[in-house]
Amino acid sequence: MACPLDQAIGLLVAIFHKYSGREGDKHTLSKKELKELIQKELTIGSKLQDAEIARLMEDLDRNKDQEVNFQEYVTFLGALALIYNEALKG
């Protein structure tokens, strides 16, 4: 039986691959795929405007190829984890 952290990491990977490759490269997220992932998989997703998602995409896309690769996605998750941790502190 997998440990909870193993399961959580597996879920993060599975969610990336659930949305990646619907358009173009199966190992990256397009802007449309990233938007869909955020809106369907994160509570904050329904609150973000298109302009905010576009800015997020620009910030995440470090290599400026107009797609978010897995490393860029993990950077995003790390930033979210820091925000969630701060919220728990109160």
From Swiss-Prot:
GO cellular component, one term: perinuclear region of cytoplasm
Domain of life where this protein originates: Eukaryota
Topological category with respect to the lipid bilayer: Peripheral membrane protein
GO MF term list: calcium ion binding; calcium-dependent protein binding; monoatomic ion transmembrane transporter activity; protein homodimerization activity; S100 protein binding; tropomyosin binding; zinc ion binding
Sites bearing N6-acetyllysine, chain numbering: 40, 47
Modified residues (Phosphoserine): 46
InterPro entries: EF-hand-dom_pair, EF_Hand_1_Ca_BS, EF_hand_dom, S-100A6, S100/CaBP7/8-like_CS, S100_Ca-bd_sub
Subcellular location, record wording: Nucleus envelope; Cytoplasm; Cell membrane
Binding site for Ca(2+) 2: 61, 63, 65, 67, 72
Induction behaviour: Preferentially expressed when quiescent fibroblasts are stimulated to proliferate. It is inducible by growth factors and overexpressed in acute myeloid leukemias.
Listed GO biological process terms: axonogenesis; positive regulation of fibroblast proliferation; signal transduction
Post-translational note: The N-terminus is blocked.
Major site of localization recorded for this protein: nucleus
Role: May function as calcium sensor and modulator, contributing to cellular calcium signaling. May function by interacting with other proteins, such as TPR-containing proteins, and indirectly play a role in many physiological processes such as the reorganization of the actin cytoskeleton and in cell motility. Binds 2 calcium ions. Calcium binding is cooperative.
Name listed for the protein in its UniProt record: Protein S100-A6
Species of provenance: Homo sapiens
